[in-house]
Amino acid sequence: MTAETALTVANLRKVFVTKHNAVVEAIAGVSLTIARGEVLAILGPSGCGKSSLLRVLAGLDEDYEGTIDWSLRQAPQDRLLGATVFQADSTMPWMTVEKNLRIGLSGLRLSPETIEQRVAENLSLVGLGDFRRAYPHELSGGMRQRVAIARALATHPLLLLMDEPLAALDAQTRIVMQQELTKIWQRTHSTVVYVTHDIAEAVTLADRVLVMTSRPGRIKAIRSVPFGRDRDVFAMRREAAFRELEADLWAMVRDA
């Protein structure tokens, strides 16, 4: 991880108005700095504003107070500046799995050979190499989510925003994907903001873990993960340091 800043958030506040005109404060005074190449996981109780924060960072919600200063303003021609993976199914139902990935690469300057390589490599990564000509309706919900993950990863984004991307996967596939994600991020040096309810997953993937309070969401604590980026997700879970941090984070989320 480098010390160069990717983005800085200052005094971010997000308010919703319900259909009954009640004002609900979702996020209150969040300030943080994320380094280039850092993987930041966000934990917190349900409804604390984790997904709202991610949508603001993604530029999908511009109705907020505070400032977001982006240092990442331009990407190389073979990489996307930013990509998102959310919980909802985002596959294009009229396109095959392969075309879902290809359309994600269409705005980049890549040779046909490189496009094919990225499609094949990322479908293999998520275990869908044999389904490239299938349509989304022929896949399970978990498989469609893997298509969305592969589509985002294939763009080699400088910034990757992910909201519970592995939640729909079975336990075995989820662990395998965690290992593969750590390898990819070590290779591509992407900056990643990763929202999850799974504390073990947060420790497994992240350089730092941010814990939010109950609504309105504030930063309760930020903890560094005592493992290098070149990590074995199976071995690290047996480490005392892993279990201690997991227990510490669990207590903070429980009391948030």
State where each predicted segment sits.
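Helix-to-loop junction immediately C-terminal to a conserved catalytic motif
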Residues: A58
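Catalytic Walker B motif of ABC-type/P-loop ATPase nucleotide-binding domains
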Residues: L160-D163
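Conserved ABC ATPase "signature" region
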Residues: R102, E113-F131, K183
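Conserved signature/switch motifs of ABC ATPase nucleotide-binding domains
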Residues: A134-H137, T155
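The feature captures the beta-strand-to-loop junction immediately N-terminal to the Walker
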Residues: L43-P45
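Short coil-to-helix segment of the ABC ATPase nucleotide-binding domain corresponding to the Q-loop/switch region
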Residues: M95-I103
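Conserved ABC transporter NBD signature motif
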Residues: G66-D78
